[in-house]
Design a protein with these regions (language model features):
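C-terminal target-recognition/interaction regions appended to catalytic cores
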Residues: 150-320
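Class I S-adenosyl-L-methionine
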Residues: 11, 24-38, 42-204
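Short, well-ordered alpha-helices that flank and scaffold nucleotide-derived cofactor binding pockets
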Residues: 9, 72, 248, 252
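Terminal non-domain segments
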Residues: 1, 138-139, 260
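SAM cofactor-binding core of SAM-dependent methyltransferases
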Residues: 1-23
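Residues at alpha-helix caps and immediate loop-helix transition turns in enzyme cores, especially N-
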Residues: 3, 94-96, 242
Length: 320
């Protein structure tokens, strides 16, 4: 897969492993659970997203199976620090509410907007993690809202119009639009946002480089070639601002120190988070924390594992 190859090219020294999980799948060796190891999972959310109205019960069950598989893995391993990201829907919230009831000391979750952490877009996602990590994320002060214009200036890009629109319409039939002086709509994998005039007239569709700027990716981050492939990779990524916040919280817990003051990601140079195609679930931790150098004591170990394919079977080690 192209994003997997580009991940290794974008982050020198990272180890990427392509594996098939589930019954009959590959056996992968992960480092043992440790206080300085953070595990992250972003299972495919396409079948669970509210945007997919025609998802069958089988599709939804498959999506939930992947979500539960990742959570069961962390619980069975006894990981000290972990996080899961997915869409926030009544269905996904119900799943995590049940796990929280069964494992109150190990599992908590919250619906968070990446805009509160410095992303130049509205991006509401469900984040699950140990209770201490969720508490720190909820306690972080909201970042100053970053506009599309600011994000593009930081990335060295020109705005192509004074407004943009998504694929939805208002009740009167007019397109849903926003000014470049505001935050963008959520960046999606299936289709990019569209530049338009203030009266809604289409100028052109955003390219993947522009979409990447709205996800806080560095201008130097290499993207897959091809507009559809690039957009799919960017739209399915964990937003860099949220990734940074999660790791800041994880580091604070590990070091038993207050969380460092958060600075919006679009205003500071930083390496972006890994990408994933819709057919992948990935278990990962972001690249070594930005504020922690290799010679410092609190560098978290980082692993990168992209998982291709999935067949769900409950883990026997997790009792109801």
């Amino acid at each position: 897969p192209v994003p997997l190859k580009l991940l290794a090219a974008n982050v020198p020294g990272v180890k990427a492993v392509l594996s098939t999980l589930g019954p009959g799948g590959d056996t992968i060796e992960l480092p043992p659970a440790a206080p300085d190891l953070h595990m992250h999972a972003s299972s495919p959310c396409t079948e669970l997203s509210p945007a997919k109205y025609n998802a069958s019960q089988s599709d939804v069950a498959t999506g939930l199976g992947m979500l539960e598989w990742a959570l069961n893995l962390f619980l069975e391993r006894g990981d000290h620090s972990w996080s899961i990201e997915n869409v926030s829907t009544p269905t996904t919230r119900k799943v995590f509410a049940e796990y929280k009831r069964r494992f109150p000391r190990e599992v908590d979750f919250a619906t968070l907007d990446a805009a509160d952490f410095g992303a130049p877009q509205t991006r509401v996602r469900l984040i699950a993690a140990p209770p201490s990590l969720i508490k720190l994320l909820q306690q972080m002060p909201s970042a100053r809202r970053v506009s599309v214009r600011e994000a593009f200036e930081a990335a060295g890009l020109e705005v192509a119009a004074e407004a943009f629109k998504n694929q939805t319409r208002n009740r009167d039939g007019s397109p849903c639009m926003r000014s470049v002086e505001e935050q963008s709509f959520t960046v999606c994998a299936s289709h990019a946002l569209t530049w338009c005039s203030r009266d809604g007239k289409t100028v052109r569709v955003m390219n993947s480089k522009e979409s990447a700027a709205l996800m806080n990716f560095s201008p130097t981050w290499r993207l897959p070639t091809g507009s559809r492939t690039g957009q799919r990779a960017v739209g399915n990524a964990l937003c860099v601002a949220m990734s940074k916040a999660i790791m800041q919280a994880a580091i604070a817990i590990y070091k038993d120190e207050p969380v460092a003051l958060y600075i919006p990601a679009t205003l500071t140079p930083m390496p972006p988070a890994p990408l994933a195609l819709p057919v992948h679930a990935h278990i990962m931790s972001p690249t070594p924390p930005l504020s922690v150098r290799a010679d410092q004591e609190a560098v978290l170990k980082s692993i990168e594992t992209l998982i291709k394919g999935y067949r769900h079977e409950p883990l026997s080690g997790i009792a109801p």
